[in-house]
Protein backbone atom coordinates (compact mmCIF):
# COMPACT_ATOMS: atom_id res chain seq x y z
CA UNK A 1 0.00 0.00 0.00
CA UNK A 2 3.02 2.29 0.26
CA UNK A 3 2.15 3.08 3.87
CA UNK A 4 4.87 2.41 6.46
CA UNK A 5 4.28 -0.59 8.74
CA UNK A 6 3.37 0.14 12.34
CA UNK A 7 4.40 -2.11 15.24
CA UNK A 8 2.97 -2.01 18.75
CA UNK A 9 5.26 -3.59 21.33
CA UNK A 10 4.67 -4.70 24.92
CA UNK A 11 6.86 -6.97 26.99
CA UNK A 12 5.57 -10.11 28.66
CA UNK A 13 8.55 -11.31 30.69
CA UNK A 14 8.99 -10.98 34.43
CA UNK A 15 11.86 -10.67 36.84
CA UNK A 16 12.87 -13.89 38.53
CA UNK A 17 15.54 -15.89 40.26
CA UNK A 18 17.84 -18.84 39.58
CA UNK A 19 19.18 -21.30 42.15
CA UNK A 20 22.90 -20.66 42.63
CA UNK A 21 23.65 -23.06 45.52
CA UNK A 22 21.96 -25.48 47.91
CA UNK A 23 23.76 -25.74 51.25
CA UNK A 24 23.99 -28.77 53.56
CA UNK A 25 21.25 -27.34 55.83
CA UNK A 26 18.77 -27.12 52.95
CA UNK A 27 18.94 -23.37 52.45
CA UNK A 28 18.95 -22.20 48.85
CA UNK A 29 21.06 -19.31 47.54
CA UNK A 30 19.70 -17.45 44.54
CA UNK A 31 20.80 -15.00 41.88
CA UNK A 32 18.46 -12.30 40.59
CA UNK A 33 17.24 -12.27 37.00
CA UNK A 34 16.30 -8.73 36.08
CA UNK A 35 16.06 -5.51 38.02
CA UNK A 36 14.97 -6.58 41.49
CA UNK A 37 15.72 -4.14 44.33
CA UNK A 38 17.20 -6.07 47.25
CA UNK A 39 15.26 -4.02 49.80
CA UNK A 40 12.08 -5.93 48.85
CA UNK A 41 13.41 -9.50 49.17
CA UNK A 42 13.05 -10.41 52.86
CA UNK A 43 9.75 -12.16 53.53
CA UNK A 44 8.75 -12.51 49.88
CA UNK A 45 7.10 -15.77 48.87
CA UNK A 46 8.57 -17.45 45.77
CA UNK A 47 7.67 -20.39 43.59
CA UNK A 48 10.54 -22.46 42.21
CA UNK A 49 9.97 -24.53 39.10
CA UNK A 50 11.52 -27.89 39.90
CA UNK A 51 11.53 -31.35 38.35
CA UNK A 52 8.52 -32.38 40.47
CA UNK A 53 6.51 -29.18 39.92
CA UNK A 54 6.25 -25.92 41.81
CA UNK A 55 7.84 -25.58 45.25
CA UNK A 56 6.95 -22.69 47.59
CA UNK A 57 9.55 -20.93 49.64
CA UNK A 58 10.18 -17.70 51.53
CA UNK A 59 13.15 -15.34 51.23
CA UNK A 60 14.87 -15.07 54.56
CA UNK A 61 18.01 -13.63 56.11
CA UNK A 62 19.48 -13.68 59.61
CA UNK A 63 16.78 -13.64 62.31
CA UNK A 64 16.26 -10.23 63.91
CA UNK A 65 17.12 -11.50 67.42
CA UNK A 66 20.46 -12.94 66.21
CA UNK A 67 21.49 -9.85 64.24
CA UNK A 68 23.83 -7.30 65.89
CA UNK A 69 22.05 -4.02 66.72
CA UNK A 70 24.14 -2.09 64.18
CA UNK A 71 23.04 -4.48 61.40
CA UNK A 72 19.32 -4.91 62.18
CA UNK A 73 17.95 -2.38 59.70
CA UNK A 74 20.46 -2.72 56.88
CA UNK A 75 19.29 -4.02 53.51
CA UNK A 76 20.95 -7.35 52.88
CA UNK A 77 22.33 -8.17 49.43
CA UNK A 78 20.90 -11.29 47.81
CA UNK A 79 24.17 -13.08 48.64
CA UNK A 80 23.14 -12.81 52.32
CA UNK A 81 19.57 -14.02 51.76
CA UNK A 82 18.30 -17.56 51.35
CA UNK A 83 15.21 -19.27 50.13
CA UNK A 84 13.70 -21.46 52.83
CA UNK A 85 11.53 -24.26 51.40
CA UNK A 86 11.13 -26.04 54.74
CA UNK A 87 13.86 -28.59 54.04
CA UNK A 88 16.19 -29.66 56.86
CA UNK A 89 19.07 -30.63 54.57
CA UNK A 90 20.18 -30.75 50.95
CA UNK A 91 18.76 -34.27 50.49
CA UNK A 92 15.26 -32.99 51.32
CA UNK A 93 15.70 -30.18 48.79
CA UNK A 94 16.70 -32.78 46.20
CA UNK A 95 13.60 -34.89 47.04
CA UNK A 96 11.49 -31.79 46.38
CA UNK A 97 12.91 -31.86 42.85
CA UNK A 98 15.06 -28.73 43.12
CA UNK A 99 18.59 -28.33 41.81
CA UNK A 100 21.09 -25.63 40.91
CA UNK A 101 19.94 -23.80 37.78
CA UNK A 102 16.20 -24.09 38.47
CA UNK A 103 14.21 -20.88 38.11
CA UNK A 104 11.94 -19.12 40.56
CA UNK A 105 9.39 -16.33 40.37
CA UNK A 106 7.44 -14.27 42.86
CA UNK A 107 4.34 -16.14 43.99
CA UNK A 108 1.42 -14.56 42.22
CA UNK A 109 -1.10 -12.62 44.17
CA UNK A 110 -3.77 -10.22 43.06
CA UNK A 111 -6.80 -8.51 44.46
CA UNK A 112 -9.25 -5.76 43.62
CA UNK A 113 -10.18 -2.84 45.84
CA UNK A 114 -12.91 -0.69 44.37
CA UNK A 115 -11.80 0.08 40.83
CA UNK A 116 -8.10 -0.58 41.51
CA UNK A 117 -6.38 -3.85 40.62
CA UNK A 118 -3.21 -4.93 42.46
CA UNK A 119 -1.13 -7.65 40.76
CA UNK A 120 2.35 -8.84 39.81
CA UNK A 121 3.52 -7.76 36.36
CA UNK A 122 0.38 -5.76 35.72
CA UNK A 123 2.30 -3.42 33.42
CA UNK A 124 3.02 -6.37 31.10
CA UNK A 125 -0.55 -7.56 31.01
CA UNK A 126 -2.05 -4.09 30.67
CA UNK A 127 0.26 -3.31 27.75
CA UNK A 128 -0.68 -6.48 25.89
CA UNK A 129 -4.40 -6.01 26.63
CA UNK A 130 -4.25 -2.41 25.40
CA UNK A 131 -2.59 -3.42 22.14
CA UNK A 132 -5.15 -6.18 21.58
CA UNK A 133 -8.08 -3.81 22.17
CA UNK A 134 -6.58 -1.11 19.97
CA UNK A 135 -5.95 -3.50 17.07
CA UNK A 136 -9.51 -4.82 17.31
CA UNK A 137 -10.86 -1.27 17.12
CA UNK A 138 -8.81 -0.21 14.08
CA UNK A 139 -9.03 -3.48 12.15
CA UNK A 140 -9.93 -2.71 8.54
CA UNK A 141 -9.63 1.06 9.02
CA UNK A 142 -6.05 1.46 7.78
CA UNK A 143 -4.05 0.45 4.73
CA UNK A 144 -0.75 -0.06 6.52
CA UNK A 145 0.56 -3.32 7.91
CA UNK A 146 -0.03 -3.51 11.67
CA UNK A 147 1.98 -5.77 13.96
CA UNK A 148 1.51 -6.69 17.60
CA UNK A 149 4.72 -7.78 19.27
CA UNK A 150 4.86 -9.47 22.69
CA UNK A 151 8.55 -9.32 23.52
CA UNK A 152 10.69 -11.04 26.13
CA UNK A 153 14.01 -10.17 27.78
CA UNK A 154 12.91 -6.60 28.51
CA UNK A 155 13.76 -7.19 32.16
CA UNK A 156 17.39 -7.87 31.25
CA UNK A 157 18.29 -5.41 28.52
CA UNK A 158 17.07 -4.00 25.23
CA UNK A 159 17.77 -7.37 23.58
CA UNK A 160 14.03 -7.89 23.28
CA UNK A 161 13.78 -5.49 20.38
CA UNK A 162 16.72 -6.79 18.34
CA UNK A 163 14.77 -9.51 16.45
CA UNK A 164 11.91 -7.06 15.87
CA UNK A 165 14.17 -4.40 14.39
CA UNK A 166 15.84 -7.00 12.17
CA UNK A 167 12.45 -8.12 10.83
Regions found by a protein language model. Name each.
Residues 1-167:
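N-terminal hydrophobic/helix-forming segments and targeting peptides
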